[in-house]
């Protein structure tokens, strides 16, 4: 069995302002950095990250001294016209209202479709799993984005829930396991051990 920790990056200024932060490569905010320094994730054998700064910085704080493997396909969604804006700033935008009315199923204007985003993330996740199997890694961490985690869990979790119900807070995520032999034979499933409640990992 391979154990994976799917961890959402720490908080950024854009997160604090409820902005759609996808391709915008902003760093962690001070609050996010301070919060992560209080957390205590287990040691792992490999760390895989999105190429965006907020994920790389989070990995460096949570797993100091561990080399990180950049997986381009694990990056967050390209929100196109909505990028780096919040719902208040998008009020009155007809494209935004159409997207809301579609329950988030329409492609982001000038950005990615849900299907394209998910397909890209799953390719990246398959690369991670293949790397773990090839290198005999028994426990690894993925420091990625909220949307990326939701795509992976919606597709592979042994508990059936829709995309938005897999949402996690900054610094939180999921502990999952997979059987590498079943995975190699096409039976791709993640056993959900627990949701990572970020507050339970804080040093007192």
Identify the role of each PLM range.
Residues 202-204:
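Conserved small/polar residues in nucleotide/adenosyl-binding loops
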Residues 49-50, 119, 143-144:
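Short beta-strand scaffold positions
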Residues 62-120:
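Phosphate-handling substructures
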Residues 2-66:
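Active-site-proximal alpha-helix that buttresses catalytic centers in soluble enzyme cores
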Residues 157-185:
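Domain-level recognition of soluble alpha/beta enzyme cores
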């Amino acid at each position: 069995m391979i154990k994976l920790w799917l961890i959402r990056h720490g908080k950024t200024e854009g997160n604090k302002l409820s902005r759609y932060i996808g391709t915008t490569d902003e760093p962690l905010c001070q609050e996010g950095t301070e919060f992560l320094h209080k957390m205590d994730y287990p040691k792992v054998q490999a760390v895989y990250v999105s190429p965006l700064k907020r994920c790389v910085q989070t990995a460096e704080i949570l797993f100091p001294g561990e080399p990180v493997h950049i997986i381009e396909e694990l990056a967050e969604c390209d929100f196109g016209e909505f990028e780096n804006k919040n719902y208040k700033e998008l009020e009155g935008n007809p494209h935004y209202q159409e997207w809301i009315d579609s329950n988030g199923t329409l492609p982001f204007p000038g950005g990615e479709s849900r299907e394209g985003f998910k397909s890209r993330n799953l390719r990246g996740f398959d690369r991670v799993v293949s790397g773990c199997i090839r290198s005999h890694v028994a426990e690894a961490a993925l420091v990625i984005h909220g949307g990326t985690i939701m795509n992976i869990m919606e597709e592979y979790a042994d508990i059936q829930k829709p995309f938005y119900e897999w949402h996690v807070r900054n610094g939180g995520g999921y502990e999952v396991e997979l059987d590498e032999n079943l995975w190699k034979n096409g039976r791709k499933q993640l056993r959900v051990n627990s949701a990572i409640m970020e507050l339970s990992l804080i040093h007192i």
